[in-house]
Amino acid sequence: MDIKLISKKKNIEERKQLLSELHASKSVIVEKDEELVCPMCDSKNIIKDYEKAEIVCEDCGCVLQDNLFDVGPEWRAFDHEQRVKRSRVGAPMTYTIHDKGLSTVIDWRNKDSYGKDISADKRAQLYRLRKWQRRIRVSDASERNLAFALSELDRIASKLGLPRNVRENAAVLYRGAVEKGLIRGRSIEGVAAAALYAACRRCKVPRTLDEIAEMSRVDRKEIGRTYRFISRELKIRLAPTSPIDYVPRFASELKLPGEVESKAISILQKAGDKGLTSGRGPTGVAAAAIYIASVLHGTRKTQREVADVAGVTEVTIRNRYKELTEHLDIDVTL
């Protein structure tokens, strides 16, 4: 199938004519600067609908392509067990394992390829082979340190319930620090915790330094110092954490309805426009906005409950509450 590129057109009629010609030839792929762009409204909100085999603009509804190929497997699976059994490839490459997941391991089950039990003498041989394989997977001290650091990263991330993309990001940052020799003179646990904190901020999955310090074996001050150092050396550009980023998590832990969450975000957006969030701890401002929104909605939570979830004091919530209600003219009846 020929692929034609549609450049940006000033005349809307010219665009329509070109689009109709391409639809007739069944070769519509709209692209600009390596990104899919709608030729009708210049939107980049393009949806690939594999069920209908279409590429559609989310904003104006223009169908850019109606014969999209499905590049997935030819087999179907209805549960995880079937998916594992029918898959003909191994696990994807990952930065969270020291060898990037490219090595293989001897299965712990003492069964052959037909599912039959292995004899006792073969079982002893397999035990020795497994032991030696574990040893040779880590060839030198640097690999051993990397394996330990990545396991520490995974341990902290598991305790904090962080998603896969944050773990991958943290592993990439830690590997970058190793390549630049930033680990020398610093604890492996400290650099791992700092990389995880940076990854959380980069992926918009906010966690405070206190939360990470609580789950790691390093104190808050060392994590903060190491984070600033590796951010400077690796040239990581991170915007300040917004209080809005904390609202979904706090609201979920408090079991508040979606209306309260939306109202809290609206309050914080207005507060940001008036400069009320700058220079203040994002968790405290987010907690105060959630408290105000819960009172306005009628699903009231106590200041103590909100403070415990946000990890701040009741005094902080009261101070931020007073600032928000006064400057935003919010009438709250307690």
From Swiss-Prot:
Pfam families: TFIIB, Zn_Ribbon_TF. Stabilizes TBP binding to an archaeal box-A promoter. Also responsible for recruiting RNA polymerase II to the pre-initiation complex (DNA-TBP-TFIIB). Keywords: Metal-binding, Repeat, Transcription, Transcription regulation, Zinc, Zinc-finger. A zinc finger (TFIIB-type) spans 34-65. Zn(2+) binds at residues 38, 41, 57, 60. CDD domains: CYCLIN_TFIIB_archaea_like_rpt1, CYCLIN_TFIIB_archaea_like_rpt2. InterPro entries: Cyclin-like_dom, Cyclin-like_sf, TFIIB, TFIIB_arc, TFIIB_CS, TFIIB_cyclin, Znf_TFIIB. This is Transcription initiation factor IIB. Belongs to the TFIIB family. GO terms for cellular component: transcription preinitiation complex. One of its GO terms (biological process) is transcription preinitiation complex assembly. It comes from the Archaea. Sequence repeats lie at residues 151-234, 245-326. One of its GO terms (molecular function) is DNA-binding transcription factor activity. Transmembrane segments: none annotated.
